Amino acid sequence: MAGLEAIKYGRGRLEVLDQLRLPHEFVYDNVSTCEEAFDSIKSMRVRGAPAIAIVAALALAVELHHKKDDSKTKQETVQYINKRLDYLLGSRPTAVDLSNAIKLLKRVSQAAAETTGTNDDNAACANVRNGYIVAAEKILEDDLTTNLAIGRYGAEYLRRQQMPIGEENNDDPSKFFTTSPPCTQGAMDKTYRKLSVLTHCNTGSLATSGHGTALGIIRSLHKMNYLDHAYCTETRPYNQGSRLTAFELVYEKIPSTLITDSMAGALFARMKDIKNISAVIVGADRVARNGDTANKIGTYSLAVLAKAHNIKFIVAAPTTSIDLETASGEDIKIEDRAPTELTQISGAVVGKDGHVDVNSTARVAIAHQGINVWNPSFDVTPSMYIDAVITEKGEVVRSSQGTFDFKAIMPERWAQQVEGKEPNGKAQVDDGTLFQMENI
């Protein structure tokens, strides 16, 4: 493989990596309809807030490329687009990237219909389809640029938190890095300990168009020679950490160790000083206006543990994951998933000799099938436990008053969605159709 790709796209064709088969099988599913995209998202064959939005947007682009709408007028094309997007929204209601992308694509499609300069119905329909397709492809293109920026900002933020070593140290030089303070030409180099981090769930190339958000920061730390070690949780019950993040870390040859979700406290207590564990870095399915963050179940527990051990807790998310229309985490809808995700598990068969047969899989029960199960897919971490939100526009750090101010990095969206103003200063009268992605 030249590189890990969750999504392969060429105009008119979309393939999505079936992540339920990882790490033992590498299989791409052809996605040619919105129904197939819905099923891929709902079944978690594709997951990660950015990837979900991209797959949904591109699946409809594929339909439109092949003219499956069968529209006779431009307004029929817009109606078809809106209906299909509303359907796709139901595949993952917690992920704000999906709802934001849908708002954008509806707006783009309507604008294309209003500005088409032809009286030919066939040409007008084609213009609306093309406007949608170009906008959907732009979401894919901009996601990678966004992730690279998040990685860079996050790595530099964590580097700035490190204290220089005052005296000469003769320990293993591979555990240290040397750098001059930024913007200080000619200043003396200072030596710092490399840092270690813990991450949860999967937020890398498999959850995005490439590089990743939280895992993207880890990639950037490693590339910049700031990273000592990366720890990842298995992330029960779907094991995205053990199946996917561990797979990516090994593939990238990043020094790493897998732990169970319940080992994090012990890891911090025993290894914080030894390994210079400086941060827990997680992604986000939705960040509310006050900084409360919905993410994979188990994130909240890690935030509480990080605070108890004086370890930075960092959320890595594109600005499209920040929901300014949701005041706090209390307003975030959390979906429940099937009980069998806790009581059963699938994997490659291990023979008596210890050999893993990747061509043979089995599903086994690991709990009494009669037990009641509570299986929320996400939890909400209160903003008081979050030190910084890293975006493609830089970091937003929790203030001394315990608040997050996203206005500085998203002034236009803030004016529209919080203050109720249109770009020209007029009051906004609808419920969000003016939403626009920062990178489109």
From Swiss-Prot:
Principal place of residence: cytoplasm
Site annotation Transition state stabilizer: residues: C201
Keywords associated with the record: Amino-acid biosynthesis, Cytoplasm, Isomerase, Methionine biosynthesis, Nucleus
Active site: D285 (proton donor)
Protein's cellular compartments: Cytoplasm; Nucleus
Pfam families: IF-2B (PF01008)
Enzyme class, first EC level, given as a word: isomerase
GO biological process terms, semicolon-separated: L-methionine salvage from methylthioadenosine
EC nos: 5.3.1.23
GO MF, one annotated term: S-methyl-5-thioribose-1-phosphate isomerase activity
Gene3D superfamilies the record matches: translation initiation factor eif-2b, domain 1, Translation initiation factor eif-2b, domain 2
Highest taxon of source: Eukaryota
InterPro entries xref list: IF-2B-related, IF-M1Pi, IF_2B-like_C, Initiation_fac_2B_a/b/d, M1Pi_N, NagB/RpiA_transferase-like
Catalyses which reaction(s): 5-(methylsulfanyl)-alpha-D-ribose 1-phosphate = 5-(methylsulfanyl)-D-ribulose 1-phosphate
Pathway: Amino-acid biosynthesis; L-methionine biosynthesis via salvage pathway; L-methionine from S-methyl-5-thio-alpha-D-ribose 1-phosphate: step 1/6
GO-annotated cellular components: cytoplasm; nucleus
Similarity comment: family membership: Belongs to the eIF-2B alpha/beta/delta subunits family. MtnA subfamily.
Summary of the function given for this chain in its UniProt record: Catalyzes the interconversion of methylthioribose-1-phosphate (MTR-1-P) into methylthioribulose-1-phosphate (MTRu-1-P).
Annotated protein name in UniProt: Methylthioribose-1-phosphate isomerase
Lineage: Eukaryota, Fungi, Dikarya, Ascomycota, Pezizomycotina
